[in-house]
UniProtKB/Swiss-Prot annotation:
It is found in: Mitochondrion outer membrane. The lineage of its organism: Eukaryota, Metazoa, Chordata, Craniata, Vertebrata. It is a multi-pass membrane protein. Belongs to the FUN14 family. This is FUN14 domain-containing protein 1B.
Length: 188
């Protein structure tokens, strides 16, 4: 891969340094990254007649991973890293997003399933679909037997429930914020 300096965005900073963002291939993602870098470092667009320092985004990205900024070097429990207010905000915002998406997707899924069922009923009533009720009953009984047989073989569910309960107990502040945000997201 050869670097091309496409001069998409040349910026000047507060310390009067000139920075040219180096782009690899000129795609739209790189343009957004260049704009983000200039915005993040409080840079303003400048003219091309000045000298500048070249900043290679690929090299910067290799050295500075986003998860190091988010989680730090030692990513321990949330209770050790953030204050209670920050934990509540993190839980509340993520819960609100999850609740809002759950509400929107739930409405869409319910509409799709209900509409499909309604269309099937109309088609059945109109004679377009003939249902073999004996075969349906046979398949339902077969499924019941399989469920009874598998009911005693589900220790995985118990371990998932135990792990979820332990996580809830260890991170009660974040969990409470998440539940509250989830309910607010469902209501909005």
């Amino acid at each position: 891969m050869s670097k091309k300096s496409t001069n998409i965005f040349t910026c000047s900073g507060a310390q009067h340094k000139w920075i040219q963002v180096v782009n690899i291939d000129g795609n739209i993602f790189s343009i957004y990254v260049c704009f983000f870098v200039c915005f993040f470092f409080y840079l303003e667009p400048s003219s091309d007649d000045e000298s500048y320092e070249v900043l290679d985004l690929t090299e910067y990205a290799r050295r500075h991973h986003w998860w190091n900024r988010l989680f730090g070097r030692n990513s321990g429990p949330l209770t050790e890293k953030y204050s209670v207010a920050t934990q509540i905000v993190i839980g509340g915002v993520s819960g609100w997003c999850a609740g809002f998406l759950f509400q929107k997707v739930g409405k869409l899924a319910a509409t799709a399933v209900g509409g499909g069922f309604l269309l099937l009923q109309i088609a059945s009533h109109g004679g377009y679909i003939q249902i073999d009720w004996k075969r349906v009953e046979k398949d339902v009984n077969k499924a019941k037997r399989k469920i009874k047989k598998e009911a005693n073989k589900t220790p995985e569910i118990n371990t998932v429930i135990e792990k979820s309960t332990d996580f809830f107990k260890k991170n009660i502040v974040v969990s409470g914020g998440f539940v509250g945000g989830f309910l607010i997201g469902l209501a909005s």
